[in-house]
């Protein structure tokens, strides 16, 4: 098979429908054992001064951190998939297995409390910061 240039590949992808592209991505992920999902959470690097300023104000954004899955890992994985949008089964399992991990970042207090309640009901240990 002749090697296709990046430009030729992009032209070929441009002709595909969204359904065909979705099927291609799934097949690519399976063949090469990779994932095209965006990272769930990325910790922001910040200095001490902004943290001190935030502490002086009333906190309006919260992070939900999965500390441990507990004994009911399958239930926790289901809840993680429910509260973290766009997460596949494998990604949710990897996230739960890799605890402690941040699940949600910079969400409203109500959303953080709701996620914490659901995760704790499933048997997980969760902190909200």
From Swiss-Prot:
The keyword Cytoplasm does not apply. Keywords: Ribonucleoprotein, Ribosomal protein. Coiled coil: none annotated. GO terms for biological process: translation. CDD domains: Ribosomal_L7_L12. SUPFAM superfamilies: ClpS-like (SSF54736), Ribosomal protein L7/12, oligomerisation (N-terminal) domain (SSF48300). It holds the Pfam family Ribosomal_L12. One of its GO terms (cellular component) is cytosolic large ribosomal subunit. InterPro entries: Ribosomal_bL12 (IPR000206), Ribosomal_bL12_C (IPR013823), Ribosomal_bL12_C/ClpS-like (IPR014719), Ribosomal_bL12_oligo (IPR008932), Ribosomal_bL12_oligo_N_sf (IPR036235). One of its GO terms (molecular function) is structural constituent of ribosome. Homodimer. Part of the ribosomal stalk of the 50S ribosomal subunit. Forms a multimeric L10(L12)X complex, where L10 forms an elongated spine to which 2 to 4 L12 dimers bind in a sequential fashion. Binds GTP-bound translation factors. Belongs to the bacterial ribosomal protein bL12 family. Forms part of the ribosomal stalk which helps the ribosome interact with GTP-bound translation factors. Is thus essential for accurate translation. NCBIfam families: L12. This is Large ribosomal subunit protein bL12. It comes from Mycobacteroides abscessus (strain ATCC 19977 / DSM 44196 / CCUG 20993 / CIP 104536 / JCM 13569 / NCTC 13031 / TMC 1543 / L948) (Mycobacterium abscessus).
């Amino acid at each position: 098979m002749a090697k296709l240039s990046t430009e030729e590949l992009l032209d070929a992808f441009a002709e595909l429908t969204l359904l065909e592209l979705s099927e291609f991505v799934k097949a690519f992920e399976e063949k090469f054992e990779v994932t095209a999902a965006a990272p769930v959470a990325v910790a922001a690097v910040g200095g001490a001064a902004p943290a001190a300023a935030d502490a002086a104000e009333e906190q309006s954004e919260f992070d939900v951190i999965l500390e441990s899955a507990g004994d009911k890992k399958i239930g926790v994985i289901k809840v993680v998939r429910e509260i973290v949008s766009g997460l596949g089964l494998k990604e949710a399992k990897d996230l739960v297995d890799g605890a402690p991990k941040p699940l949600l970042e910079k969400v409203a207090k109500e959303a953080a409390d709701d996620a914490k309640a659901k995760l704790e009901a499933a048997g997980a240990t969760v902190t909200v910061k």
